[in-house]
């Protein structure tokens, strides 16, 4: 007998037929003699619909009340799935995030898990029940409901797998695994049999929507192997693990784009020690995540600094720079995107960057900023060119 954690996204439970499809997958796993914990997201576009409803009431809802509202989406999903499982003769019980033992910090709408009290889950498993848990949510020290942010259900599933020392953690999506690019946008993609935690973490943080990056961080920390599978097609998917069999195989594992990018530029910054700390320290205090940073060569005691952040954080970043750091010559560009290639094989092979740049040159795509690491190369380009860039780079590297 194995203990298996299965997570299903919103598209997998979006309507009655999909719910019963998921119920059959879970029931088959349980009937094979396994203990099963299921983590479920809100149905379809429920979260977006709830956000829209809040917008009908106020343009500035409190983060606490937003968490109270958004957590209701998962509660609908878990109840319906538990009903479907019981209808199939598979004893199941639904638990909210806090009933399942998720405790978080006080960062409403983007809370982090501080601990997981597994007694209730373990008790229900001992009664031979399938435990259906609401992902994305928990309870803080004030006994307030909190949510983990977009993709938080993946993180919930990995946390349960780590805490219970599960034999498997299966993440079911609407695609059949991890591909070298988004198969819905690029025609000649390849499905990966395996990918390392580090490679998957880079792809997830770059906008590949198969797995949430926080869930991959957690899986890497506790060495929880993940299986990415399709809820609609019962074929082998992709295993995410510490070391893969083909470490000396494919140089590049994926090409990804991220359109949630803004480029902020500060002109005429005093070229003196401590200025970078002043700027980015203030941004860090506001929890603004900065990605690529570019500083020009100083002239006449002045320099220019550009950096990227999420588009949704650009307005706050501008306000911090103007009001707290007292910079007046600040501009923002929200027409950008980031395209990246990821692969551990780049560490020991030359010429990969050249091919990436050649692909964009051949398609008249201008590169505005470049960032590199041991396993990643990223370029900031015009957002309108993002899909074309991904396709061209993929063709260059994988054909």
Predicted segments, located by residue:
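Nucleotide/pyrophosphate-binding catalytic subdomain
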Residues: 1-216, 308, 381-382
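Short phosphate-binding/catalytic loops that engage adenosine nucleotides
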Residues: 34, 90, 224, 288, ...
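Glycine-rich beta-alpha junction loops
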Residues: 43, 175-177, 222-226, 230-235, ...
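Non-catalytic alpha-helical coupling and interface elements of nucleotide-dependent molecular machines
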Residues: 55, 59, 90, 223-227, ...
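Short hydrophobic alpha-helical runs that function as membrane-insertion/retention elements
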Residues: 168-172, 226-228, 291
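Acidic-aromatic/histidine active-site loop/patch
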Residues: 219
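A conserved regulatory-domain signal marking ACT and ACT-like small-molecule sensing domains
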Residues: 236-399
